[in-house]
Amino acid sequence: MACSTFSKPLKDKINPWGPLIILGILIRAGVSVQHDSPHKVFNVTWRVTNLMTGQTANATSLLGTMTDAFPKLYFDLCDLVGDYWDDPEPDIGDGCRTPGGRRRTRLYDFYVCPGHTVPIGCGGPGEGYCGKWGCETTGQAYWKPSSSWDLISLKRGNTPKDQGPCYDSSVSSDIKGATPGGRCNPLVLEFTDAGKKASWDGPKVWGLRLYRSTGTDPVTRFSLTRRVLNIGPRVPIGPNPVIIDQLPPSRPVQIMLPRPPQPPPPGAASIVPETAPPSQQPGTGDRLLNLVDGAYQALNLTSPDKTQECWLCLVAEPPYYEGVAVLGTYSNHTSAPTNCSVASQHKLTLSEVTGQGLCIGTVPKTHQALCNTTLKTNKGSYYLVAPAGTTWACNTGLTPCLSATVLNRTTDYCVLVELWPRVTYHPPSYVYSQFEKSYRHKREPVSLTLALLLGGLTMGGIAAGVGTGTTALVATQQFQQLHAAVQDDLKEVEKSITNLEKSLTSLSEVVLQNRRGLDLLFLKEGGLCAALKEECCFYADHTGLVRDSMAKLRERLTQRQKLFESSQGWFEGLFNRSPWFTTLISTIMGPLIILLLILLFGPCILNRLVQFVKDRISVVQALVLTQQYHQLKPLEYEPQ
């Protein structure tokens, strides 16, 4: 009898899988800051996917924290095998397509090898990451494969091997012991201690093989993915009701560059411009790169382990920003601050707000899921200013401060939110999967947004710093850079809307001018409407409302900038005004401190060293002198 290619006594079964060199984004690490409560509850979904067929073997959802939402997952071995094996063997059959194939599959042991961390020589996807013995970390076999570092353990369920004929109850309902779908190979997946501590930012892959005494062990692969969602719904807050009808941005039209000006003919007088050209404003590409760079700086400060190797991608379709409702302590002012105006109410709508935070005013039932605490304003004339790094998302628009008088007289409501750009985070496994050879099914990438990774960081950091004196750790240059990038992008949005309003006004003037010309041409017939025998249409100019909203928007952006600058100390402002100052100080601070210590303690240490050497030399000299001379014995005189 021929020996099995994948039998237990053999060691190296195949040549090692050649390494695949992939260029990732290697990023330096920063300082870690705890940014989320460990008691926060999420909607966690675990999904087991057969990578050979793309079918879902198990999808389990539960409510829990990030430290205890690790349930047992139950599914069938045939959900991972499918109807056919890649390399069918005569005694295995085609797979789980027939009752006989399902029954024969149940007779064999199986072992599992990890694909998320592949040891040297364990092969690739084609071998199920089991290129040699010792790569298996779990399974159901006579040698009891196990591991102390793998993330899961996969064993057979409670059904004994000799129970059930593996018939499908929907086809053969009269046969005793038939099960739905003919499932007779139950498996139980449990998380190990290492798996409960691991980062599940992306899908993890394993290979499973049936152990046979002869022939080749058949292979299948499966992935395990965790999806985390906030319990609260994603609802819009703002005055714009047409949010769900947004379309992705159209492709940009190619702009023809103007030809360079021809040099003037000889003898012609050259014209010198009187004014200098205006300073170049940052373009769209620069602003988008600033957003991504600011997102990286903030993420690197809070979670340096996630930025060792990753992809940060800016979402190219609306919504471009999302809000995270937070709890915070606002400031109460009896008079209007200089950076806050009660009358200005611009019309920026935040289309996605998640989480639960502080609400003020009359909150409708559709938005009460966003409220952890709802406050009613007392009567009086005072102003509520949002903390640094946050803003009020109201049904009238985004604003840095509120008027209690306006809230008491109206049914308006506001939610305290943090504003985050829509930047998605992709782990290294997503990049590697793009270069792997696809056999049948391409894995769906799992992405996390910046709001999910950093949501609540501003208020959480401030709350933690009140008792520990570490509030300054949150107000760092990284978060200020992200805040400045968001403000610059909002200013460009305001400019774009203003330019659109001007274009619409110009177009309406052209249309009205054409209308007057046509009325003159058809004057004998009584005008254009009489000639067409239609009702006359008149132009209603609403661009004034847009112009007023844009003026208020510019005013509010200026106020937010003043509020941001007023919250900074003189020391932080010094670093912001001189960006090179940070690099200079960090470069020369170490050598300066070492030089200062040498100047302070160097003379004392040198004197001690010289005195010690002198003492040792004196002792040595004394020893040398004593060795050259010896004491004479006293002479005894005889009496005469």
Swiss-Prot record:
Q: What positions does the record give for the motif labelled CX6CC? A: 529-537
Q: Where, in residue ranges, is this chain on the Cytoplasmic side?
A: 606-640
Which superkingdom is the protein from? Answer: Viruses
Q: Give the record's keywords alphabetically.
A: Cleavage on pair of basic residues, Coiled coil, Disulfide bond, Fusion of virus membrane with host cell membrane, Fusion of virus membrane with host membrane, Glycoprotein, Host cell membrane, Host membrane, Host-virus interaction, Lipoprotein, Membrane, Palmitate, Signal, Transmembrane, Transmembrane helix, Viral attachment to host cell, Viral envelope protein, Viral penetration into host cytoplasm, Virion, Virus entry into host cell
Instruction: Outline which residue ranges sit on the Extracellular face.
Output: 33-584
Where are lipid groups covalently attached, annotated S-palmitoyl cysteine? C604
Q: Where is this region: Disordered?
A: 259-284
Leader sequence range is: 1-32
Q: Where is this region: Fusion peptide?
A: 446-466
Q: What is known of its domains?
A: The 17 amino acids long immunosuppressive region is present in many retroviral envelope proteins. Synthetic peptides derived from this relatively conserved sequence inhibit immune function in vitro and in vivo.
PANTHER family tied to this protein: BC035947 PROTEIN-RELATED, VIRAL ENVELOPE PROTEIN
Name this polypeptide is given: Envelope glycoprotein
Organism per entry: Rauscher mink cell focus-inducing virus
Q: Name the gene behind this protein.
A: env
